């Protein structure tokens, strides 16, 4: 909690239609996006963050958040932002309508850097690009275990200053 209290937010450089850009794309930098998909009926938010993963500490450079965008329209937004950020790697949550979004990115928009997960039974899911020869799926299937491990890793990265961000919505969540 003390780390969260010390975080300071800054206004984004650009803000338009749910997309807040804190740092513009830089050539030769690598980016990754984590995507969470909602139904677009005003309750939960469809959202993603763009993270510069070139060096440590990693830095959140952009964020999208909208609770009205329909799952059929969301892939186009993801695609455009990912392309602008040097063909960012995308990890999409595929529970419920997330699977539809990942499928549109892969098969309709033919996005090359969509990450996949290999299902390893009790060993869980392994993130990769689908070349493991194992049973793979587009994106990550969210479960209590995945959420718990992800939350603990996120907490550690924030506390150890390995992930930096200055977005108001992220800090308040």
What is each of the regions a protein language model found here?
Residues 1-119, 129, 144, 148, ...:
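RNase H-like, metal-dependent nuclease domains and their acidic two-metal-ion catalytic environment used
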Residues 122-123:
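C-terminal accessory subdomain/extension
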Residues 135-138, 142, 152:
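Domain-level recognition of nuclease-like catalytic cores that cleave nucleotide substrates
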